[in-house]
């Protein structure tokens, strides 16, 4: 959705959709953004939700000089970004969303901060409405490594887990800074060579984790033999504040592409109506991973937008990146990139040149994203 108006350098949007995209791009471009009529028609709970306010507070912590104006009802916000500072910080995330909701913003902004980012986030590590920390560790960080080239200082560590609804988890995210991101041409996804996974169980019987592992491995061993799933059984303070269990599977290809899928059990309130069965959970996550592999491309479908961001901000050379069918979220992100950076992409369906290549890209129709980077330079980074 294009901005409804533009006052000087300030972009004006309407509605609550894609708030995180707009705030991230505002921080990177330095352009102020005003968003009005945020759930103004919702009579019971108009305005920004608590998790959205928590995200704005996090962006305020990693920047220096940011100005935020909220109207009393919370239905309008004016966000004037400052310089990305980074450094060491702690943040208690709202438990209405998983930590993955906030980590997405840190991964996008981290390489362009003044100081290397070392962030401790507390909240829900595994939830249904946000990518889990295991998903991000497997899919998003592997993508970021391709653009950083040297991944020294890049780390995502799970200190303790916490599932919905009460959370209680904690993670530490470290990200190095770069002067600029390199242009990249990545058009080969390779063949899946191994599958790794993590099953966690918090305040429930260890048998739940073992049954989930058996069901997931039963599906995946039909396709390849190299399947290993690690069991993470937590007790006491290390298991957060709520009971639950879940699983994350990561498929790695011969070219280093990672596809991920995760699934978690229902909360205690939801389990009263529909209890979670470990065998069904294991089978569901296996099918989700197979669907992700079928989509294909050189990036997990959840992080197509991140690949688009990095190649758009790269050096002034042609970058090409192969993805699966574009998600709705990625399509809107490309539109927002045009609004903030005036950059457009060339999107085309690649055609195989020979039969061998056609077999390698078997699966869903692929999309080749191509653009000339804007040559974004990290002005915040110290130059010695």
UniProtKB/Swiss-Prot annotation:
Keyword Nucleus in record: yes
**InterPro entries (UniProt xref):** RNA3'-term_phos_cycl_insert, RNA3'_phos_cyclase_dom, RNA3'_phos_cyclase_dom_sf, RNA3'_term_phos_cyc, RNA3'_term_phos_cyc_type_2, RNA3'_term_phos_cycl-like_CS, RNA3'P_cycl/enolpyr_Trfase_a/b, RPTC_insert
Q: Which Pfam families match?
A: RTC, RTC_insert
State whether keyword Nucleus applies.
yes
Which keywords fit this entry according to its UniProt record? Nucleus, Ribosome biogenesis
Spell out the Gene3D superfamilies in the cross-references: RNA 3'-terminal phosphate cyclase domain (3.65.10.20), RNA 3'-terminal phosphate cyclase, insert domain (3.30.360.20)
Q: Name one GO biological process term.
A: ribosomal small subunit biogenesis
Q: Where in the cell is it found?
A: Nucleus, Nucleolus
Q: Which GO terms describe its cellular component?
A: nucleolus; small-subunit processome
Q: Which PANTHER family match?
A: RNA 3' TERMINAL PHOSPHATE CYCLASE, RNA 3'-TERMINAL PHOSPHATE CYCLASE-LIKE PROTEIN
Family named by the database record? Belongs to the RNA 3'-terminal cyclase family. Type 2 subfamily.
Q: What's this protein's function?
A: Part of the small subunit (SSU) processome, first precursor of the small eukaryotic ribosomal subunit. During the assembly of the SSU processome in the nucleolus, many ribosome biogenesis factors, an RNA chaperone and ribosomal proteins associate with the nascent pre-rRNA and work in concert to generate RNA folding, modifications, rearrangements and cleavage as well as targeted degradation of pre-ribosomal RNA by the RNA exosome. Does not have cyclase activity.
NCBIfam families attached to this UniProt entry: 18S_RNA_Rcl1p
Quaternary structure, from the entry: Part of the small subunit (SSU) processome, composed of more than 70 proteins and the RNA chaperone small nucleolar RNA (snoRNA) U3.
Name the record gives this protein: Probable RNA 3'-terminal phosphate cyclase-like protein
The species is: Drosophila melanogaster
This protein's encoding gene: Rtc1
């Amino acid at each position: 959705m294009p901005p409804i108006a533009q006052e000087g350098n300030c972009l004006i949007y309407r509605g609550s959709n894609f708030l995180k995209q707009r705030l991230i791009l505002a921080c990177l471009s330095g352009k102020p953004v005003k968003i009005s009529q945020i759930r103004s028609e919702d009579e019971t709970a108009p305005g920004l939700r608590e998790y959205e306010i928590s995200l704005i507070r996090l962006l305020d912590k990693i920047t220096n000089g940011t100005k935020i104006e909220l109207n009393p009802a919370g239905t309008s916000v004016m966000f004037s970004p400052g310089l990305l500072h980074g450094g060491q910080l702690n943040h208690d995330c709202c438990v209405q969303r998983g930590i993955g909701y906030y980590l997405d913003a840190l991964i996008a902004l981290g390489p362009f901060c003044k100081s290397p980012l070392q962030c401790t986030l507390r909240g829900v590590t595994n939830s249904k409405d946000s990518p889990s920390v295991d998903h991000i560790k497997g899919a998003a960080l592997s993508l970021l490594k391709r653009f950083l080239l040297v991944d020294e200082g890049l780390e995502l560590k799970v200190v303790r887990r916490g599932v919905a609804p009460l959370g209680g988890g904690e993670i530490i995210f470290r990200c190095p800074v770069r002067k600029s991101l390199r242009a990249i041409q990545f058009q080969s996804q390779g063949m899946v060579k191994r599958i790794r996974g993590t099953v966690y169980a918090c305040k429930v019987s260890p048998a739940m984790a073992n049954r989930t592992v058996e069901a997931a491995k039963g599906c995946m061993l039909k396709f390849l033999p190299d399947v290993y799933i690690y069991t993470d059984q937590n007790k006491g303070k290390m298991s957060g504040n709520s009971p639950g269990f879940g699983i994350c599977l990561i498929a790695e290809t011969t070219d280093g592409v990672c596809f991920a899928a995760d699934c978690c059990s229902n909360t205690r309130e939801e389990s009263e109506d529909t209890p979670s069965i470990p065998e069904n959970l294991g089978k569901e996550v296996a099918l989700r991973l197979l669907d992700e592999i079928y989509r294909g491309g050189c990036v997990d479908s959840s992080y197509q937008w991140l690949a688009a961001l990095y190649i758009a901000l790269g050096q002034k050379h042609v970058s090409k990146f192969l993805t699966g069918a574009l998600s709705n979220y990625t399509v809107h992100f490309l539109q927002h990139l045009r609004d903030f950076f005036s950059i457009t992409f060339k999107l085309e369906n690649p055609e195989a040149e020979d039969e061998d290549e056609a077999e390698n890209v078997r699966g869903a129709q692929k999309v080749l994203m191509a653009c000339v980077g804007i040559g974004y330079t990290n002005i915040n980074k110290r130059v010695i």
